[in-house]
A protein has these predicted regions:
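Short loop/turn elements at sensory-signaling interfaces that couple input to output
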Residues: 114-131
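PAS-family sensory domains
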Residues: 38, 101-107, 120
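PAS/PAS-like sensory domains
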Residues: 28-34, 79, 87-98
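Short, charged amphipathic alpha-helical "coupling" segments at sensory-output junctions
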Residues: 7-23, 146
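PAS-family sensory domain signal
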Residues: 16-70
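Short regulatory alpha-helical coupling segments
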Residues: 148-167
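PAS and PAS-like sensory/regulatory domains
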Residues: 33, 96-98, 105-114, 129
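PAS/Per-ARNT-Sim sensory domains
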Residues: 59-87
């Protein structure tokens, strides 16, 4: 009897995940952002094919592994991202709100804002994150020629954490 219950739960989980994945193309048409589904249990991230035009990923029907996703994350940001994903995977967090860099098809660093929320069953056994990646957030903060943060971004950083006086 328990085996049948587990099968039904697994089947429901798979159907629910597929439902969200099928919604992606419809939502994707209405925005410049990239919406994603992260199946935490299966360790796969799903995007529409549109992301492959900007980033060096091959179109995958069955989603991307975390290894594939990390291949386009800037090396300096990988550790931070992995720490965040592990907290989510362990159930310590149910949201993600990170800013990090991806490397596009031209080899250019692109600052992104990545936000998502976990949808899970009551026991947090089958977590699925639904979220979005936005590139436009940082376009006002970055010098297009050098890729360095500009004075507006520096002023925002100083407002958050003023320089400590040394003496």
């Amino acid at each position: 009897m328990k085996e049948k219950e587990n099968f039904e739960k697994t089947d429901h989980y798979a159907k629910e995940t597929q439902f969200y994945i099928k919604l992606l193309p419809f939502i994707d048409e209405s925005t410049d952002d990239y919406f994603f589904i992260w199946d935490v249990k299966k360790r796969r991230v799903y995007f529409t094919a549109r992301i492959t035009k900007q980033y060096p990923l091959e179109e995958e029907e069955n989603g991307y592994t975390l290894k594939q996703w990390l291949s386009i994350v800037h090396p300096c940001d990988k550790r931070m991202l992995l720490e965040e994903l592990n907290k989510i995977k362990q159930g310590q967090k149910d949201t993600q709100d990170l800013n990090y860099r991806l490397i596009d098809r031209m080899g250019k660093n692109v600052w992104i804002s990545c936000r998502g929320n976990i949808i899970a069953d009551t026991k947090h056994k089958n977590p699925i994150m639904i979220g979005r990646i936005c590139e436009n957030v940082f376009s006002l903060w970055e010098d297009e020629l050098t890729g360095l943060m500009n004075a507006s971004k520096m002023a925002m950083d100083f407002e958050k954490k003023p320089l400590e006086q040394t003496g």
